[in-house]
Amino acid sequence: MNRGKALQLVKPHLTEHRYQHTIGVMETAIDLAKLYGADQQKAELAAIFHDYAKFRDKNEMRTLIREKLSQQDILFYGDELLHAPCGAYYVREEVGIEDEDVLQAIRFHTTGRPNMSLLEKIIFLADYIEPNRQFPGVEKVRTQAKTDLNGAIISSLVNTITFLLKKNQPIYPDTLATYNQLLLEQK
């Protein structure tokens, strides 16, 4: 699927702000794919569709997870996480993308997971550092991403985990497991 067609398919599902975010994620993912030797076309496609289900009805997504998806535990960790596994499902069913690499990158872009593929890492990080994102610590992660993909992911996870702890929010187990795995690999 070419870029124009993909963007045309995703745009009706997003607000203008989220569409601009998606463009930023796409451009960042392509840059990271070039830098780290990942498949640029897959990175582009996964980035374009990563938030495909972002604005779906929450009850509809909860029902989908309960009835058809394996990530049942995600239901206990906040509505912000639902769109990733549901997005992978909807992209397969509604858009017809069957490339499991692309679908996995969409599925885990919010939480991460241990043993992420290179493509999954790129989409996870591109979503965090795309140019429209402005929050404390993002510039450091952007700089780090140019030379150390895993280190940048660790930094993004530290920021996310710290943010959730300060808000007294639960942390999805795969997020902690991703942090632990990447940190232990660096030692």
From Swiss-Prot:
Binding site for ADP: 21, 51-54, 83, 109-110, 127, 133, 170-175
Domain HD: 18-132
EC number: 3.6.1.41
Domain of life: Bacteria
Keyword Zinc-finger annotated: no
Region forming the signal peptide: none
Enzyme's top EC category: hydrolase
GO molecular function list: hydrolase activity; metal ion binding; nucleotide binding
Residues that bind Fe cation: 21, 50-51, 127
Assembly and interaction partners: Homodimer.
Protein family membership: Belongs to the Ap4A hydrolase YqeK family.
Record-linked PANTHER family: BIS(5'-NUCLEOSYL)-TETRAPHOSPHATASE, SYMMETRICAL (PTHR35795:SF1), SLR1885 PROTEIN (PTHR35795)
Protein name as it appears in the record: Bis(5'-nucleosyl)-tetraphosphatase, symmetrical
Organism (species): Halalkalibacterium halodurans (strain ATCC BAA-125 / DSM 18197 / FERM 7344 / JCM 9153 / C-125) (Bacillus halodurans)
